[in-house]
Amino acid sequence: MKKTVAVVGVGSAGLQTLCHLCTWLDNTWKIISIHNPEIKAVGVGESTQPPFLGALRTGIDFNVYDHLAPMKATIKVGSVFKKWRKHSFINPLFAGSIALHIDTNAIKDFIIPRLKERWPVKLEVKEQDVQDLNALDYDYIVDCRGYPTDFSEYIKPPAMLINHALIHSFKRPGTTNYTGQTATKDGWMFDIPLPQRHTHGYLYCDKITSQSEAKKNFSKILKVPPSQLDKTEFSFPAYYAKTVFDGRIFKNGNRAFLFEPISALSLYI
């Protein structure tokens, strides 16, 4: 009888976990990927760290020459910080390594088929709506379902620097290989350069700055009238799980914690 581990969720944390487990578990294990196809990714675009690319290299034999375009990704060599100090500065990735800017709407359809092709004996993919992890009959479960819906088993820090994001995308390719991180009067703004669009996110605390004020300041930076900004926005609390390991269940990615998205720590750690 094979040992089993289920990975629930196919966002960036779930896909990275699948690549890692397929690579390092031997054929005495069965790995089950479970996701609900009705749940859509936030679809903003994401700046990753080198371990994500490393997991893709070992998990699906990813290489930037052949696979950047079909995955709708771009190379990331670091982050550029603007207006945090008198002069802008670049924070390069360590030791000449590279990472990826990814389209969260595109990565599942790129990665899952390649995992199935490379690991046909080890991997099984299921479409299933999971409400109760304890009802799943597997030896171990990795919970990668993103933001929690119930915070009773989480701790929320009393102070929150930012908790809301306004999103706007220009329908033109990004032109740099850096994640943009610009200080603003309300918080900071990210920009993610992708092959098909350039996405900006204005991050602020809605307990301090009103939505209308944030939109006005965001539109001024982008030189886009407030009425023409994309309607995409979302809130995100800061939190961390009281326990990451709970018997046979392990929380990963945003299911485990979220403090501040500037360093992509939920995926990196």
Give names to the regions the model predicted:
Residues 20, 109-222:
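Predominantly flavin-linked oxidoreductase catalytic cores and closely associated redox partners
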Residues 17-29, 55, 59, 117-118:
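A short, Lys/Arg-enriched amphipathic alpha-helix followed by its capping loop at the start of a domain
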Residues 6-8, 32, 250:
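Conserved beta-strand elements of the Class I
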Residues 38-94:
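N-terminal FAD cofactor-binding segment of flavoenzymes
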Residues 22-44:
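Glycine-rich FAD pyrophosphate-binding loop
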Residues 13, 39, 148:
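Conserved Rossmann-like nucleotide-cofactor binding loop
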Residues 101, 204-269:
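FAD/FMN-dependent oxidoreductases across multiple families
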Residues 2-13:
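Beta1/beta-strand and adjacent pyrophosphate-binding region of the FAD-binding site
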